[in-house]
């Protein structure tokens, strides 16, 4: 299996990503049998529900210390000690100490909403220039709303992929008035890069949620959470029709990998140069929640 590489934003170094359950992922996405099996898993939600139920059993706590060690996760950032987690899912949905993720200051600064690997495309209309032709992507299919497609079709898009070892709570990227969340039922295909390499439309087929944010600095912003293999539950902890500050918690994903997608209207944001440079090279940039993504063009 070809090793996955990304740019670590803290060091600006190219890093090879540790793949959780690498042998299983190789089987699922490099063999005919594996691809058939992965499709079966994605289209059979009861299997994800069973897996999620298992991960909430108390005996799964035994997996936590080894998982933390293998993935070099910093326990000093946790609100709880390792011994306090009631299950592996409880650990997976962990909260962090506020000081662990400082928020970039300035009303005109948009921040990363999650810990994850980021790809940024400043013009959705030119999306094909940044990805190989086999990676089909339909904004209409993703949003399922003609008025939203018209509104964001010439804007920008941010993809943030969360790995299994990441902190899985998602946050508001800007100061905003948050509208209600709309649920779109779908499958639970993996969003691992091995699965995405041939088809970006996985995002359009998976279970997802959409929330529109009203902002003063960035216009309207569309926020999507996309489920993935074994992620049957996207939990919203925010209350709709209220004002929030950037960095405030919006919700969390239960066990599994997942993705956040953010859409901006045209002419509203200038992304940070390093993120654009890496994305143009086809490299994800690993960011921490609260780091700058870009600044408002309306300043």
From Swiss-Prot:
Post-translational changes noted in the entry: Is synthesized initially as an inactive proenzyme. Formation of the active enzyme involves a self-maturation process in which the active site pyruvoyl group is generated from an internal serine residue via an autocatalytic post-translational modification. Two non-identical subunits are generated from the proenzyme in this reaction, and the pyruvate is formed at the N-terminus of the alpha chain, which is derived from the carboxyl end of the proenzyme.
Cofactor: binding comment: Binds 1 pyruvoyl group covalently per subunit.
Reactions accelerated catalytically: a 1,2-diacyl-sn-glycero-3-phospho-L-serine + H(+) = a 1,2-diacyl-sn-glycero-3-phosphoethanolamine + CO2
UniProt KW Signal keyword: no
Post-translational modification Pyruvic acid (Ser), affected residues: 258
Topology class, membrane: Peripheral membrane protein
Site residues by UniProt (Cleavage (non-hydrolytic)): 257-258
Single GO biological process annotation from the record: phosphatidylethanolamine biosynthetic process
Single GO molecular function: phosphatidylserine decarboxylase activity
Subcellular location: Cell membrane
Predominant location category: membrane
Annotated metabolic or biological route of this protein: Phospholipid metabolism; phosphatidylethanolamine biosynthesis; phosphatidylethanolamine from CDP-diacylglycerol: step 2/2
Pfam families, A to Z: PS_Dcarbxylase
Keywords from the named record: Cell membrane, Decarboxylase, Lipid biosynthesis, Lipid metabolism, Lyase, Membrane, Phospholipid biosynthesis, Phospholipid metabolism, Pyruvate, Zymogen
Keyword Methyltransferase included in the entry's annotation: no
EC number of this enzyme: 4.1.1.65
Active-site residues, record numbering mapped to chain: 115, 171, 258
GO cellular component terms, A-Z: plasma membrane
Organism domain of life: Bacteria
Cofactor(s) annotated in UniProt: pyruvate
Function: Catalyzes the formation of phosphatidylethanolamine (PtdEtn) from phosphatidylserine (PtdSer).
PANTHER family: PHOSPHATIDYLSERINE DECARBOXYLASE, PHOSPHATIDYLSERINE DECARBOXYLASE PROENZYME 2
Subunit structure of this chain's protein: Heterodimer of a large membrane-associated beta subunit and a small pyruvoyl-containing alpha subunit.
Family listed: Belongs to the phosphatidylserine decarboxylase family. PSD-B subfamily. Prokaryotic type II sub-subfamily.
Protein name per Swiss-Prot or TrEMBL: Phosphatidylserine decarboxylase proenzyme
Organism, scientific name: Chlamydia felis (strain Fe/C-56)
Gene responsible for this protein: psd
């Amino acid at each position: 299996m070809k090793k996955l590489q990304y740019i670590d934003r803290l060091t600006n170094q190219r890093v090879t990503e540790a793949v959780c359950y690498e042998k299983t992922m190789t089987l699922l996405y490099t063999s005919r049998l594996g691809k058939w099996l992965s499709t079966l898993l994605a289209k059979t939600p009861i299997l994800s529900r069973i897996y999620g139920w298992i991960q909430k059993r108390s005996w799964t706590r035994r997996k936590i210390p080894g998982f933390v060690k293998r993935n070099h996760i910093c326990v000093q950032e946790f609100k709880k000690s390792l011994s306090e987690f009631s299950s592996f899912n409880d650990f997976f949905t962990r909260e962090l100490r506020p000081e662990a993720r400082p928020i970039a200051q300035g009303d005109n600064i948009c921040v990363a909403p999650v810990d994850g690997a980021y790809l940024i495309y400043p013009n959705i209309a030119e999306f094909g220039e940044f990805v190989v032709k086999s990676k089909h992507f339909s904004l209409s299919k993703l949003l399922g709303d003609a008025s939203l497609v018209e509104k964001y079709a010439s804007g920008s898009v941010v993809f943030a992929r969360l790995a299994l070892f990441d902190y899985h709570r998602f946050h508001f990227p800007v100061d905003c008035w948050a509208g209600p969340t709309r649920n779109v039922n779908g499958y639970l295909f993996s969003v691992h890069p091995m699965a995405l390499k041939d088809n970006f439309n996985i995002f359009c087929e998976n279970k997802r949620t959409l929330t529109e944010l009203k902002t003063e600095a960035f216009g309207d912003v569309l926020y999507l959470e996309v489920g993935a293999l074994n992620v049957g539950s996207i939990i919203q902890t925010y209350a709709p029709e209220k004002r929030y500050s950037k960095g405030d918690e919006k919700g969390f994903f239960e066990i599994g990998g997942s993705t956040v997608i953010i859409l901006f209207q045209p002419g509203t944001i200038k992304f940070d140069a390093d993120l654009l440079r890496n994305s143009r090279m086809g490299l994800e940039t690993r960011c921490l929640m609260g780091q700058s993504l870009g600044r408002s063009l309306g300043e």
